[in-house]
Amino acid sequence: MTDEVSNTAAADVRDNGQIVFDAGAIRVLAVLAEKEALTPDAYPMSINALTNGCNQLTSRDPVMALTEVDVQGILQELIADKFVAEVNQAGARVSKYEHRLRMKWSLEQDKLAVLTVLMLRGIQTAGEIRTRSGRLHEFATIADVEAALQFLIDKYPPLVARLPRAPGTKETRYAPLLSSEVFPEAGELPVAAASGVSRHDRIGQLEAEVSSLRDEVEALKAQFQQFKQQFE
């Protein structure tokens, strides 16, 4: 399924200080954080490269269809809120952009890697996060992932929520608390949703391994595109 960006502001602030982003802003921030680690030679990012990253078919849930105009508008909102900075490099013909998540939320790379994967893919288990974040940060054990998750949960306002186990599943799931989405508490998960998560858990490991290989291909494509742009 493909999601379109909404026309609402990129971010809002709740009474408790929690910042709520729309789906487009979450995707833009996550892609900036992801590509900073995966393709540092192509970072900061141009609007064209950022749009392609937002609409990437792999390692994204949901798949989106943002235009460069959409991304430009989102960037301006995020710049105003100081989550993104515009970078004008010497000799460059286009502006480029970088995220400021480390500074805004005081995050080390392991915590940023976990949050980035959650922002890109939504609800996941610690095991799935460990597998999918390997190229952003190498976690030695699942316990290390859980420690990073706990840090994000304990922040005020929290950036991540621990969700109840779905019926028929063994692993705890985690969700990013950056949107207006309301997550169920213990005992409230609908049967249909539980069934979907159960199936997701069964195939998660294989899906993550395939996505990791696809990410490598996307990284190579981005590097090649950056090389081509030097001659344009």
UniProtKB/Swiss-Prot annotation:
Name of the protein this chain belongs to: UPF0502 protein mma_2112
Coiled coil (residue ranges): none
Family: Belongs to the UPF0502 family.
Pfam families hit by this protein: DUF480
